[in-house]
Every structure is written in structure tokens, then in C-alpha cells.
Curated annotation (Swiss-Prot):
Protein name (record): Putative membrane protein insertion efficiency factor
Entry-linked HAMAP family: UPF0161_YidD
Family: Belongs to the UPF0161 family.
Membrane topology designation: Peripheral membrane protein
Keywords from the named record: Cell inner membrane, Cell membrane, Membrane
Length: 84
């Protein structure tokens, strides 16, 4: 069953998709990571919600610079402590 998005999740992912469609092609491929920072941000928001997902995305974007080696950096899984 598909999980519905909150209005904030929808807004955040729509803004990121807008970046992917309109701005990223102009700038060209620059991300040092796999998945790219914008894909990472969308996945983090879907998995962790808007606030925590945006926090993960911001931390990831701050690491995306020439001095960082980059590489594979998947979204961390959701930690459901209440279900254990």
C-alpha cells in the first residue's frame, strides 16, 4: 500500500524535483556521491519525514565538496525504537 505524503513532504519533494528538472541540467553533474544529493534528499524525506529528512539532506549537501572523497552514501534506515 502506498504511503501518503504530508503537505510539507509534498512541497519539499516538489521543490527538489524542480531543481532536478530545471537547474541541475544547466549546472551539469557535480555531486560526488551515489545517490546524488537531490535523490538522497527525496529519499530521506520519504523515509524520515520532512524535518529529519531535510536535516539529513543538509548534512549531506555540506559534505559535497572537493575535499570530501564522496562515494556511496545511502540514506540511513528509520530507527523505530517504539516497535522493538
Amino acid at each position: 500500500m502506498a504511503q501518503t505524503q504530508s503537505p510539507l513532504q509534498w512541497l519539499a519533494t516538489t521543490l527538489i524535483r524542480g531543481y532536478q528538472i530545471f537547474i541541475s541540467p544547466i549546472l551539469g553533474p557535480r555531486c560526488r556521491f551515489n545517490p546524488t544529493c537531490s535523490h538522497y534528499a527525496i529519499e530521506a524525506i520519504k523515509v524520515h519525514g520532512t524535518a529529519k529528512g531535510c536535516w539529513f539532506a543538509l548534512k549531506r549537501i555540506l559534505k559535497c565538496h572537493p575535499l570530501h572523497p564522496g562515494g556511496s552514501d545511502p540514506v540511513p534506515p528509520k530507527n523505530d525504537r517504539c516497535n522493538k
